[in-house]
Curated annotation (Swiss-Prot):
ATP binds at residues 65-72. Pfam families: RecA, RecA_C. SUPFAM superfamilies: P-loop containing nucleoside triphosphate hydrolases, RecA protein, C-terminal domain. It comes from Thermus thermophilus. GO terms for molecular function: ATP binding; ATP hydrolysis activity; ATP-dependent DNA damage sensor activity; damaged DNA binding; single-stranded DNA binding. This is Protein RecA. PROSITE patterns: RECA_1, RECA_2, RECA_3.
């Protein structure tokens, strides 16, 4: 760069810094190199599938899928993980369906959880913005986007047409929220439902409510749905297997999958999850129904193996460390096990 251009650029940078503050513009090579700050999901398998070790802070995350698929359970587990690390969490309950007893069983400290049950979509999103602007909240969950009803629709009559109101509301709110969340380092998790598009013959007929804005602004999108048969002990169903697909990821390669086991009444079992991941990584050997770690037999059946590890925390951490060393062997690309 010649001298005149260099001086002009330096003067422009000084003017910008004076007007907008230090750091408003900087050379990429001078920017501090930082690892992405994350909140663990409570599942090692999902943390590995995300590629960064959890849900990114300062970003928007969308968790969507069919009903009773484990979306709210996953979001509450993330809240529990944030609280366990001394963080503050908020739950915007637009569906008015939060069960405090279930949240407590998942490990959420309900006495410290900030909860709002807003009357309109505008009120819900303003609350999210104000909480994020405070800089004191680590994670905010909105349950759900489909329940963020614009005020005009609530005040109107049944049967009135309100085309595009919710999509415009979301678009306007997310434009403001993106910068606020980045500055406050707050993770915002939007839970969403799925709908069927009418008249779609080819391709995926599913779509999510709230327009396209959330798809664009979300750094991570997780598709959560049941997979296979329920988990049974004898003839009794005790839980469900859930497959989480990372549909979008701006921070690591997307299209990875994780299979979680959600048990009725207690949610994710992190030790059973570790056993699954350790088997996939070759750290724990499975022969028939027996699970072994090196020369040590852990037990017959996953429940017995998990129970043995709960009694030996030092062994649990040793296995976790070995799994993380072999994390590239654990992550399964979408469709890899389906013959695609």
């Amino acid at each position: 760069m010649d001298e005149s251009k260099r001086k002009a650029l330096e003067n422009a940078l000084k003017a910008i810094e004076k007007e907008f503050g230090k750091g408003a513009v900087m050379r990429l090579g001078e920017m501090p190199k930082q690892q992405v700050d994350v909140i663990p999901t409570g599942s090692l398998a999902l943390d590995l599938a995300l590629g960064i070790g959890g849900i990114p802070r300062g970003r928007i995350v969308e968790i969507y899928g069919p009903e009773s698929g484990g979306k709210t359970t996953l979001a509450l587990t993330i809240i529990a993980q944030a609280q366990r690390r001394g963080g503050v969490a908020a739950f915007v309950d637009a569906e008015h369906a939060l069960d405090p007893l279930y949240a407590q069983r998942l490990g959420v400290q309900v006495e410290d959880l900030l909860v709002s049950q807003p009357d309109t979509g505008e009120q819900a999103l303003e609350i999210v913005e104000l909480l994020a602007r405070s800089g004191a909240v680590d994670v905010i969950v909105v349950d759900s986007v489909a329940a963020l009803v614009p005020g005009a629709e609530i005040e109107g009559e049944m049967g009135d047409q309100h085309v595009g109101l919710q999509a415009r509301l979301m678009s306007q709110a997310l434009r403001k929220l993106t910068a606020v969340l980045a500055k406050s380092n707050t993770a915002a998790i939007f839970i969403n439902q799925v709908r069927e598009k009418v008249g779609v013959t080819y391709g995926n007929p599913e779509t999510t409510p709230g327009g396209r804005a959330l798809k664009f602004y979300a750094s991570v999108r997780l598709d959560v749905r049941k997979s296979g048969q329920p988990i049974k002990v004898g003839n009794e169903a005790v839980g469900v297997k859930v497959r989480v697909k990372v549909v979008k990821n701006k921070l690591a390669p997307p299209f990875r999958e994780a299979e979680l086991e959600i048990y009725f009444g207690r949610g994710l079992d992190p030790v059973a999850d570790l056993v699954n991941v350790a088997v996939a990584a070759g750290v724990i050997e499975k022969a028939g129904s027996w699970f072994s770690y090196g020369e040590l037999r852990l037990g017959q059946g996953k429940e017995k193996a998990a129970e043995a590890l709960r009694e030996r925390p030092e062994l649990l951490e040793e296995i976790r460390a070995k799994v993380l060393e072999r994390s590239d062997q654990v992550v399964l690309a979408a469709g890899e096990d389906e013959g695609e």
